[in-house]
């Protein structure tokens, strides 16, 4: 049976399929973990420890050495994405109720959901798109996008926007596994190769544990809103990213569109933030469902939009080149 190949046909499948299975488990048998106990309970409830190992391995996979072009492109996209998420957070905090929208079509929408969906790019999706439509340097720009993985950037955005306050040691605790992994991976290439193999392997495990915090009725209630959130992520982050790529990154805007997705790891952010700030716990399930839907939507639409944009840009460049030759 080609189970893995079938799952990978779904955008973000290795994250979303286990997430859905976990949600099924939680919806129809919420006490399964406590009933079985031991290792089974650990797999069902171990979101935070599994993610801690994943962040460590993610840090170990990042190479410190990169060309100036790669760093400029990557830095431009990362900073722009985070800046846009901060602006959205600042505006949303003045419009959306403190505990999120509780009634009507927008029920479940919160500042936490918006920031989590917008501040993190799907680095793997970006790299695969740019390998097809961009240069090697542009494809390699995902090197700094891994720094967005995890709750740190979301914590910084929520903290600096005045939406939440975090003690300094909480910030350190959130980033320490990543930094230790980063240090070890760059001190020893063999360790980098060893730990980086676990990055993809651990995704289904933390996705399943994360799914066990979600009730499927919440997904049903936030389905259409999640689709709209995914479209909003592409529009709201995509336009500034295109402009930044052209003006600062030295590109033609293609990399900007390719970076306008939501990362699969962003699905875990609401739960992790809620662990640190209990005030966010009531919003976490709905925010997780919204972000999960946004991940699917952006994973489908971003490659299509990037393809259309790239073809138009290249056609325009070819036309200008022909006109220049004629003259």
Swiss-Prot record:
Name of this chain's protein: 2-keto-3-deoxygluconate permease
Molecular functions per Gene Ontology: 2-keto-3-deoxygluconate:proton symporter activity
Membrane topology listed for this record: Multi-pass membrane protein
Family to which this protein belongs: Belongs to the KdgT transporter family.
Main location: membrane
HAMAP family: KdgT
Ranges that cross the membrane: 10-30, 42-62, 73-93, 95-115, 139-159, 163-183, 199-219, 224-244, 254-274, 289-309
Organism: Escherichia coli O139:H28 (strain E24377A / ETEC)
Key words, A-Z: Cell inner membrane, Cell membrane, Membrane, Sugar transport, Symport, Transmembrane, Transmembrane helix, Transport
S-S bonds: none
Gene name of this polypeptide: kdgT
GO cellular component terms attached to this protein's record: plasma membrane
């Amino acid at each position: 049976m080609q189970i893995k190949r079938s799952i990978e046909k779904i955008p973000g499948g290795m994250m979303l399929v286990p997430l859905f299975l976990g949600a099924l488990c939680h919806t129809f048998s919420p006490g399964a973990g406590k009933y079985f106990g031991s290792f089974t309970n650990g797999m069902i409830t171990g979101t935070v420890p599994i993610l801690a190992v994943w962040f460590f391995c993610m840090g170990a996979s990042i190479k410190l050495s990169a060309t100036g072009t790669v760093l400029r492109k990557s830095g431009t996209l990362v900073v722009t994405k985070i800046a846009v998420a901060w602006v959205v957070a600042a505006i949303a905090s003045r419009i959306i109720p403190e505990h999120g929208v509780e009634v009507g079509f927008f029920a479940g929408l919160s500042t936490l959901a918006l920031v989590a969906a917008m501040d993190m790019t799907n680095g793997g999706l970006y790299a695969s798109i740019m390998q097809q439509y961009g240069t090697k340097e542009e494809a390699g720009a995902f090197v700094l996008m891994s720094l967005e993985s995890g709750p740190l950037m979301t914590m910084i955005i929520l903290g600096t926007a005045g939406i939440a306050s975090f003690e300094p040691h909480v910030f350190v605790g959130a980033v320490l596994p990543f930094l230790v992994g980063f240090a070890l991976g760059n001190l020893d290439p063999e360790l980098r190769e060893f730990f980086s193999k676990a990055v993809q392997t651990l995704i289904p495990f933390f996705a399943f544990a994360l799914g066990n915090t979600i009730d499927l009725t919440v997904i049903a209630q936030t389905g259409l809103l999640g689709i709209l959130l995914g479209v909003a992520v592409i529009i709201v982050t995509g336009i500034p990213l295109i402009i930044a790529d052209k003006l600062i990154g030295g590109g033609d805007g293609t990399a900007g569109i390719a970076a306008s997705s939501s990362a699969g790891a962003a699905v875990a952010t609401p739960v992790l933030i809620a662990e640190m700030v209990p005030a966010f716990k009531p919003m976490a399930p709905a925010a997780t469902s919204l972000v999960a839907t946004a991940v699917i939507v952006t994973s489908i639409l971003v490659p299509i939009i990037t393809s259309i944009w790239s073809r138009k840009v290249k056609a325009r460049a070819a036309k200008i080149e022909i006109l220049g030759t004629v003259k």
